[in-house]
């Protein structure tokens, strides 16, 4: 990963050529396929480790490599974060899905040297109204951020759009959502995590410009309660500080002259 200090002075979010965006979209398609396979396999009695094995199989059969596996010592190909887990949940045989669970899966793949990164949230069977609203609000916040990925905007215009999407969802669903503090999106390309960091809230009009070819991984994380989190003893799993449930949606998105291009679609 390029040292962050070298990138903080950039005036433009790093750009990719048309061919490089196509290469990233190929990696993103692998991620999308893995997430579809996980979603199809998730059922009561299924362990989160078995979902990880499915993802790794799909990724490797596509000629790609899991981005997460071994990253700073991370031991799996996906992050499986269930109920009050926000992000970075480590899959295990002991963690078995049950009806009503709220499941967030984050997945990354590298193909021909280019990374794709995406996350989805879904229920095991029917969700409570609150959990359904939480997941939808998070997805809608993501869509709001994607819509702001246009030439001439600045980094925090995307952050502000995500926050505005969250506040609009609060009105739509008649409940408050916590925007998880300290976590957000990032640049992506030849490395999975690159500058700039993308907050999920904040004032608009600041930070580097978006230009054609700029790419960001946009990933809002919302809770039904607090904005605060705790990292468990495994040094990876992030949970809500108050035990409230959390949701996480993510896409890798490029700025083009024709508008936003989602690179993690199937």
Curated annotation (Swiss-Prot):
Optimum temperature is 55 degrees Celsius. It retained half of its activity after 10 minutes of incubation at 55 degrees Celsius. A divalent metal cation 1 binds at residues 106, 117, 250. One of its GO terms (biological process) is protein processing. It holds the Pfam family Peptidase_M24. Substrate binds at residues 88, 193. Keywords: Aminopeptidase, Hydrolase, Metal-binding, Protease. Inhibited by various metalloform-selective inhibitors. It is an enzyme of class 3 (hydrolase). GO terms for molecular function: initiator methionyl aminopeptidase activity; iron ion binding; metalloaminopeptidase activity. Its EC number is 3.4.11.18. Monomer. Removes the N-terminal methionine from nascent proteins. The N-terminal methionine is often cleaved when the second residue in the primary sequence is small and uncharged (Met-Ala-, Cys, Gly, Pro, Ser, Thr, or Val). Requires deformylation of the N(alpha)-formylated initiator methionine before it can be hydrolyzed. NCBIfam families: met_pdase_I. This is Methionine aminopeptidase 1. The lineage of its organism: Bacteria, Bacillati, Actinomycetota, Actinomycetes, Mycobacteriales.
